[in-house]
């Protein structure tokens, strides 16, 4: 994972030696998560990881997600635990693809990467993301997207107002999905 994060060029320092055990544990958990995703699917692997990360999670609104047919789930992104819990809650959609920023860490998880539509850092390739999303929706698939494109303020930490204000920065790219695949359900 250090290599995937582009950190292998760093010479060992006292700080690195101090952080190495925690980084190794994280890498082993990520490796096991990816293995489970390959064997059992994204939702099951995410459920395993969510239980490791949090004492408990409560998800509501899952009944709004249709079991079949084109669907786009728009979600805020306050952090990793929320994301993993959301993925675990979408077990009814094994066809789920996640629109996510292209990061070396995610590419280092091959089983997880198969469920992603990666958004490049540069705008040149972003229409390819829309085309891939539209194709998946036309095949009756489900998409999960985080329209802010970044980690957002957690309402539990920063307050509801700051979290709601962050929604103004959401991309309206989901409108393209609605135009191209009008029967899509948006949740």
Task: List the predicted regions and their residue ranges.
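Membrane-anchoring hydrophobic helices of lipid-metabolizing enzymes
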Residues: 1-71, 81-85, 113
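Soluble catalytic domains of membrane acyltransferases
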Residues: 56-187
